[in-house]
Amino acid sequence: MAKTSTKKRVKRVVSDGIAHIHASFNNTIVTITDRQGNTLAWATSGGSGFRGSRKSTPFAAQVAAEKAGRIVQEMGMKNLEVRVKGPGPGRESAARSLNNVGFKVTNIADITPIPHNGCRPPKKRRV
């Protein structure tokens, strides 16, 4: 049987990009893109080995950000702009850990969507 030819993925060299941190109450998703918005690497708290209530901790967000950061460091990325979205507990720790990995963070922006009285929010918990 003939061997099927598969294209080897070309390693891209990108010097600066954007880190999108989506911090919900249950999970934190870190996506690192180039300037055009093409995804280079991503990681989540759940995918980093945390399950249940540990997924929503600042430490889990830190581990996810470091995991995504190491992947794009191999591509030669040095400068990052950080965009944070959501009210979750992993907001600051994920942004701080990207700085600790060795990136030069040029800008931190909060792009959390704020409704002009749109959908009804979830009811308050009675514990």
UniProtKB/Swiss-Prot annotation:
UniProt keywords, alphabetically: Ribonucleoprotein, Ribosomal protein, RNA-binding, rRNA-binding
Alphabetized GO MF terms: rRNA binding; structural constituent of ribosome
Name by which UniProt lists this protein: Small ribosomal subunit protein uS11
Domain of life of the source: Bacteria
Organism: Nitrosococcus oceani (strain ATCC 19707 / BCRC 17464 / JCM 30415 / NCIMB 11848 / C-107)
Any GO BP: translation
Pfam family, one: Ribosomal_S11
GO cellular component, as recorded: ribonucleoprotein complex; ribosome
Family of the protein in this entry: Belongs to the universal ribosomal protein uS11 family.
